[in-house]
């Protein structure tokens, strides 16, 4: 818990640091955002199969620096409560040291602390109505904390309690991000915004241990090594509602 708070504090300090440096350009905006996220799991190898879309949440701090009238650098701090549901094949040894495979149906959840870095392109205002539309594209750099899973096996029901598997899932998260939205100016210094963003991980979420490798040995020799790695990737469509000052 202390490590998580320290990490969030570091992200906040970085975000506020950008604020202090940007005010001299008189184009900085800072605010808050919140909204749901619709998550599903992908695999570039096909070894993991998506089993449906799960609903998570995201909230955080938003920071924008306008270096031109219609162009801004977007950053801040995102706290994403990710969810997922996928299945894969694992293996176990029987009494004769023969590898038997079985299906694992896995639901998982985790918290990802992320710093986005995006280019925002904004339209001009249309007429007298103070509404502008925008598109944004960039990347997200994140840290995954306390990923938990609940597994159902062939003939074994899923437990009610999620178990922590931090060593199995990588802490590193790197994602491509793109989105569209609209912002409404309340006055010269305050505006509301609504955005729909797509996020796609491009770094494997699974470490090179079980279940990327069957975890069973005969003597000192590992057997049943998985030929095709899971290569798990998180996808999300998120809706954000926020306010900027």
Feature locations, PLM:
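Sec-dependent signal peptide recognition
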Residues: 2-8
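Outer-membrane beta-barrel biogenesis signature
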Residues: 5, 15-31, 223-229
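Short glycine/proline- and aromatic-enriched beta-strand/turn motifs that initiate or cap beta-hairpins
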Residues: 21-62, 236, 242-245
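Gram-negative (and chloroplast) outer-membrane scaffold detector with strong preference
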Residues: 24-28, 65-153, 234-245
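Flexible, solvent-exposed loop segments that connect beta-strands
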Residues: 41-50, 83-110, 145-172, 206-230
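Transmembrane beta-barrel strand/turn architecture of Gram-negative outer membrane proteins
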Residues: 57-59, 115-119, 174-180, 184
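Predominantly the C-terminal beta-signal and adjacent terminal strand-loop region
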Residues: 173, 178, 183-245
């Amino acid at each position: 818990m202390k490590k998580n708070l320290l990490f969030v504090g570091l992200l906040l300090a970085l975000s506020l640091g950008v604020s202090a440096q940007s005010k001299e350009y008189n184009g900085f905006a800072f605010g808050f955002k919140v909204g749901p996220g619709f998550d599903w799991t992908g695999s570039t190898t096909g070894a993991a199969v998506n089993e449906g879309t799960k609903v998570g949440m995201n909230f955080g701090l938003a920071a924008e620096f306008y270096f031109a009238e219609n162009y801004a650098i977007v950053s801040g701090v995102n706290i994403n409560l990710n969810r997922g549901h996928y299945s894969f094949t694992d293996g176990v040894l029987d009494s004769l040291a023969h590898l038997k495979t079985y299906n694992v149906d896995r639901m998982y959840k985790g918290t990802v602390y992320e710093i986005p870095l995006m280019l925002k392109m904004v339209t001009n205002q249309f007429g007298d109505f103070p509404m502008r539309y925008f598109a944004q594209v960039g990347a997200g750099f994140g840290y995954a904390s306390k990923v938990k899973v609940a597994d159902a096996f062939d003939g074994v029901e899923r437990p009610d309690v999620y178990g922590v598997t931090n060593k199995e899932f990588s802490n590193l998260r790197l994602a491509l991000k793109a989105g569209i939205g609209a912002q409404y100016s309340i006055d010269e210094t305050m505006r509301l915004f609504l955005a729909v963003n797509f996020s796609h991980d491009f770094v494997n979420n699974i470490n090179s241990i079980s279940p990327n490798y069957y975890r069973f040995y005969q003597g000192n020799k590992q057997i049943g090594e998985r030929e095709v790695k899971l290569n798990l990737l998180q996808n999300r469509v998120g809706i954000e509602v926020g306010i900027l000052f």
